[in-house]
């Protein structure tokens, strides 16, 4: 459902932010 898509989107966003954080630090 729509909420599942939102949940997956948030998870992907967090993973991307963490990856960028690791590269910066």
From Swiss-Prot:
What is the top-level taxon of the source organism?
Eukaryota
Q: In which tissues is it expressed?
A: Expressed by the skin glands.
UniProt lists the family membership as follows: Belongs to the frog skin active peptide (FSAP) family. Cruzioseptin subfamily.
Residues annotated as carrying Asparagine amide in the record are 25
Tell me, in one coarse class, where this protein mainly resides. secreted
Which keywords label this protein? Amidation, Amphibian defense peptide, Antimicrobial, Secreted
The scientific name of the source species is: Cruziohyla calcarifer (Splendid leaf frog)
Q: Name one GO biological process term.
A: defense response
Question: Where does the record say this protein resides?
Answer: Secreted
Q: Which portions of this protein are annotated as coiled-coil regions?
A: none
UniProt function note: Has antimicrobial activity.
Record-given protein name:
Cruzioseptin-13
Q: Which GO terms describe its cellular component?
A: extracellular region
User: Which residues are connected by disulfide bridges in this protein?
Assistant: none
């Amino acid at each position: 459902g729509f909420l599942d898509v939102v949940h997956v989107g948030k998870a992907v966003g967090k993973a991307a932010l963490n990856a960028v954080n690791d590269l910066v630090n």
